Amino acid sequence: MGLRFPPKVLEHILSFIDSNEDRNSVSLVCKSWFETERKTRKRVFVGNCYAVSPAAVTRRFPEMRSLTLKGKPHFADYNLVPDGWGGYAWPWIEAMAAKSSSLEEIRMKRMVVTDECLEKIAASFKDFKVLVLTSCEGFSTDGIAAIAATCRNLRVLELRECIVEDLGGDWLSYFPESSTSLVSLDFSCLDSEVKISDLERLVSRSPNLKSLKLNPAVTLDGLVSLLRCAPQLTELGTGSFAAQLKPEAFSKLSEAFSNCKQLQSLSGLWDVLPEYLPALYSVCPGLTSLNLSYATVRMPDLVELLRRCSKLQKLWVMDLIEDKGLEAVASYCKELRELRVFPSEPDLDATNIPLTEQGLVFVSKGCRKLESVLYFCVQFTNAALFTIARKRPNLKCFRLCVIEPFAPDYKTNEPLDKGFKAIAEGCRDLRRLSVSGLLSDKAFKYIGKHAKKVRMLSIAFAGDSDLMLHHLLSGCESLKKLEIRDCPFGDTALLEHAAKLETMRSLWMSSCFVSFGACKLLSQKMPRLNVEVIDEHPPESRPESSPVERIYIYRTVAGPRMDTPEFVWTIHKNPENGVSHLAIK
């Protein structure tokens, strides 16, 4: 390059670049930029814990202060990844402790985190401040107690939808009396009761506490006491609202909420009785986020609540809201940017539909800033998809989950091909897309042609043949993660577009028609890919033509992993070796 920046000037310039992707691009400019970038990067994101070794990360980024780490594939959220598959945090924690003692923040998602990991964190990082565990497992409240007792500058402790061995609520007592630094505390996934007196003392001596998310065991009386201690909260996850309504309790609850002048986000509300909802009305005008995904409240009561939420930007709710409830959202919540509607029952059927596609049509017409949708329903139509695409071209995330597999447009009995063509063609900024319902290969031809910015794509029960995969891998230029289940494609498209897989983060396939022989050929052809065959009930022998139950393919610079359980077969690069599986000891 003709222009060279002095190192200090370049360091100063890089200090304004926060995006991981932008910093990655900077590091590719030249050797000196690579060196400056790696020595100054404070925040590191690893999207797949097996894509790179912990040692390589610590070696490259010696000044790392924050690590974000992801483990199991996304389909683990739907119980499609067997227990014991992997995603172990210990090698990473051990490597960080040995080389990065100045680490201050760890965020992990879908990882196996043991108490030993948490104890190592507490003992190794003298100025540790942030621990966020999302959908993690393997640890108990003893591990959390170690973090609470030792990390004297802890600002954030969040356990989000984790599976935790709950050994009792006394872990809160391990926070030292000198602990005053907490900004966010989330223990909503725990089961046991906590000592409200311990929690009150902790909250009272934490003047900067802004976010508090409680578990269902916290009663209304406990909630009232805590709100009195922390009226400065901006984010609150309540405990259970199942207690019988008493006038005195209602009055205290209303008063406590009315004093929370800065509250912007509200969640929890487990088993809330409709009679208690008016106690929340005082905070509704200031809410920007409302999560009612655990609140079994019916449509009329929801409407009374939502009509007061004029600033709402994010709404999570169950399908009990019905079409009329979403029509109210469209009328009253003009700032809405994100909508998620979850099923209230796992086995919905078309004979008792609490909401239809019309609810989402209402919102797409009335909420002009809407850019993210997750919508579970029993049936859908092409006409609804046309309207959504026309009214909301600014959508960045569209995840439609039609619960009944292979469900066509229920009014015309046609595939939903043209509707998803409209979404792909009309929503040019789409980054994430989930499709379902009856779809032919044509739908994926349209998606491949128009969805040029889609980075994550999820598909279930769709397509006719290999052409589906061909259209996606040849057309979706920005695709990084592809998840497919129960679709009728096989080897041809997978092998034909093997080079595309090296530009992606991962490909997950389950219950498709991919053969064992194709997996071996792919691994031999693409040495930088790990090809894992996952089968909990493997046959006694595997002929080349035998289909595999699940495969997980991902790009890596670390080589085959060494912690595979017996039901995971790693395809080696040496065709004579074929496959191997190593049991975890």
Curated annotation (Swiss-Prot):
Its main location: nucleus. Induction: Partially repressed by miR393a (microRNA) in response to flg-22 (flagellin-derived peptide 22). It is found in: Nucleus. Pfam families: F-box_5, Transp_inhibit. Keywords: Auxin signaling pathway, Developmental protein, Nucleus, Plant defense, Ubl conjugation pathway. Pathway: Protein modification; protein ubiquitination. 1D-myo-inositol hexakisphosphate binds at K70, K109, R110, R340, C397, F398, R399, R432, K480, K481, R505. The keyword Nucleus applies. CDD domains: F-box_AtTIR1-like. Disulfide bonds: none annotated. One of its GO terms (molecular function) is ubiquitin-protein transferase activity. Ubiquitous. The record marks S135, E161, F376, R485 as: Interaction with auxin-responsive proteins. The keyword Nucleus applies. It comes from the Eukaryota. One of its GO terms (biological process) is defense response. SUPFAM superfamilies: RNI-like. GO terms for cellular component: nuclear SCF ubiquitin ligase complex; nucleus; SCF ubiquitin ligase complex. Component of SCF(ASK-cullin-F-box) E3 ubiquitin ligase complexes, which may mediate the ubiquitination and subsequent proteasomal degradation of target proteins. Auxin receptor that mediates Aux/IAA proteins proteasomal degradation and auxin-regulated transcription. Involved in embryogenesis regulation by auxin. Confers sensitivity to the virulent bacterial pathogen P.syringae. Mediates glucose repression in yeast. The F-box is necessary for the interaction with SKP1. This is GRR1-like protein 1.
